[in-house]
Design a protein with these regions (language model features):
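Short, well-formed alpha-helical segments that are part of the catalytic scaffolds
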Residues: 19-37
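Acidic helix N-cap motif at the loop->helix transition within catalytic regions
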Residues: 26-30, 50-58
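A conserved acidic beta->alpha catalytic loop
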Residues: 45-54, 70
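Acidic/His-rich active-site region of diverse nucleotide-sugar glycosyltransferases
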Residues: 70, 76-84, 97-181, 187
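Short aromatic/hydrophobic "clamp" motif used to bind/position activated sugar donors
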Residues: 90
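Catalytic donor-sugar/metal-binding loop of nucleotide-sugar-dependent glycosyltransferases
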Residues: 171, 175-181, 187-209
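Nucleotide-sugar-dependent glycosyltransferase catalytic core
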Residues: 209-234, 274
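Non-catalytic, C-terminal membrane-associated alpha-helical segments of glycosyltransferases
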Residues: 227-234, 246-302
Length: 302
């Protein structure tokens, strides 16, 4: 019996793995196992209240740890890491994604075969192996008529839970827009790449397990659900405001507010603490966002 072939060392040396943690201490042990042998790893901690930083220092001593003074959001934290990357590629990796050196090397080697590509993602699966929907096509360009990807695809959007970046192609376009605290930052990034005629590839032969919503853990899960609803609603509105204008964002807010009120009422009548917290967070997020003030701030800054 022959020993398994080790992942190409050259491929691993060409990439820096970037991880953003926020109360993600429970994920660090699995990350450390999967990334053993990866020479370049940067972890950015978004002011966690748990022992995420201590576990990174203990279990991933070779990783560079950047501690943010406050939670600046997913995009801003990744930007802090991207600014430090000196390799050809960067790999964004959510703490709740289980990967290893073979998968990382396969992503890098596949990307090298497509020198025009800016971004590339694997096929994500859940813990049972079921495929997750982590990419889509621009609806105004064409409508897909097939099922799951069976070969390399060039798409309009790909989820940044696991995303390989060719640095020389993304730098001129800019990294994540810190306007988006959480959610829609990858939609915005992909749209800018797509508008610049960049390639966003899906590499379905590489599969990575994504334990969706597993990055953050605490003793108040309803609070995490409230935050998800709050930031998802705000980021959705901000995306529309940025790319379609304030009038479109106002119309969207009216529609989503109406549906959010109905959703809250439904969750009160059919109690589910987590779903009620998420629905209430969505409602509050929409109410709290001042589009007019935001427009004035951006006009003054720009």
């Amino acid at each position: 019996m022959t020993a398994p072939v080790a992942p190409a060392r050259d491929a691993l040396e060409r990439v820096t793995v970037l991880i953003v943690t926020f109360n993600s201490a429970h994920c660090i042990e699995a990350l450390a196992r999967g990334l053993a042998g990866v020479p370049n790893v940067i972890v950015v901690d978004n002011a966690s209240a748990d022992d995420s930083c201590e576990r990174v220092r203990s279990l991933m001593p070779a990783a560079r740890l950047i501690t943010m003074p406050a939670n600046r959001g997913f995009g801003a934290a990744n930007n802090a890491a991207l600014a430090e990357v000196a390799t050809e590629f960067a790999l964004l990796l959510n703490p709740d994604c289980l990967t290893d050196t073979a998968q990382i090397a396969a992503l890098v080697e596949a990307m090298q075969a497509w020198p025009e590509a800016t971004l590339a993602v694997p096929q994500l699966t859940d813990a049972s192996g079921q495929l997750q929907v982590n990419y889509s096509w621009p609806r105004d360009a064409w409508t897909p008529t097939t099922g799951e990807a069976t070969g390399v695809l060039n798409v309009g959007y790909a989820c940044a839970a696991v995303m390989l970046i060719r640095m020389e192609r993304l730098k001129p376009l800019g990294f994540f827009d810190p306007l988006f605290f959480l959610y829609y930052e990858d939609e915005d990034l992909c749209l800018r790449v797509f508008q610049a005629r960049g390639q966003i590839l899906v590499l379905p032969h590489v599969r990575v397990t994504h334990l969706s919503r597993g990055s953050v853990k605490g003793d108040r899960p309803w609070l995490a659900e409230y935050g998800r609803g709050f930031h998802h609603a705000q980021s959705k509105l901000l995306f529309t405001w940025k790319h379609a204008g304030v009038d479109a964002a106002r119309r969207q807010r009216r529609r989503v507010l109406a549906s959010s009120v109905l959703n809250v009422l439904a969750r009160v009548l059919l109690p589910s603490p987590r779903h009620l917290a998420r629905a209430w967070g969505r409602f509050q997020g929409l109410r709290a966002l001042n589009l007019e003030a935001l427009a004035r701030e951006r006009a003054l800054a720009g």
